[in-house]
Amino acid sequence: MSTHGWPVRSLAAQLRLPSGPAGLLVARRLNRNNREMVLAAVEATGAVPGERVADVGFGGGSGLALLLARVLPGGQVRGVEVSRTMVMRAKVLLRRPIARGSLTIELGTATALPFAAAALDALITVNTVYFLPHLEPAFGECARVLRPGGRLVICLGDPVEMADMPVTAHGFLLRPVSDVQRALTAAGLALDGHRRAGQPPFSFHVLTAHRP
């Protein structure tokens, strides 16, 4: 597949910022293709009932439902997305937990999270780091909203394998995993683990850290 065709560029744009009818289709694709990564991220939080957790850049929203299953009863999930289309979709599909107060959905960015300091016990973000021009400000914001001891889980595709995907030639920043780890420590987070999972050509990395 050419890296320059309109369909590839269009898909890249939708993966970066899902919007409109095409964005709704992309949401379903995200839930299907990212399922293993999202499951791994949610599991790595170690979240338990009563905790306050967030999914930043929740995309198709599958992580929100999985987090709810872990923290209820008594807990709360907060979802943040830069895409208005994804926010509106999630508010419709997940209106029941929203009405009960166990889920909030908000428009926001990774560098300006709509949370108070030390508001969260855990936070996940899956397949988002490729769209951040600078990692340290975003990770610093994660550190701000986590309580002391609060956990951060980042899942990202293997950068070497992703470089062979035509879509990543259009606006994806594919960094070595070691660069992501360095940005985490520079933001004041303590690294806890790094696990490689999945199978080529869709291997991925699960990074865990916490706020000291």
Question: What spans do the regions from the language model cover?
Answer:
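A short acidic, Gly/Pro-enriched loop at the edge of an enzyme's catalytic core
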Residues: 111-123
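A short SAM/SAH-binding and catalytic strip from SAM-dependent methyltransferases
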Residues: 121-135
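Class I SAM-dependent methyltransferase SAM/SAH-binding core
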Residues: 52-112
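Conserved class I S-adenosyl-L-methionine
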Residues: 151-181
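Core SAM-dependent methyltransferase catalytic element
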Residues: 197-212
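Conserved alpha-helix/loop element of class I SAM-dependent methyltransferases that forms part
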Residues: 32-51
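Short glycine-dipeptide loop
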Residues: 50, 73-74, 146-151
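A short glycine-rich, Lys/Arg-flanked "PGG" loop and its adjoining helix->strand segment in the class I
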Residues: 136-148
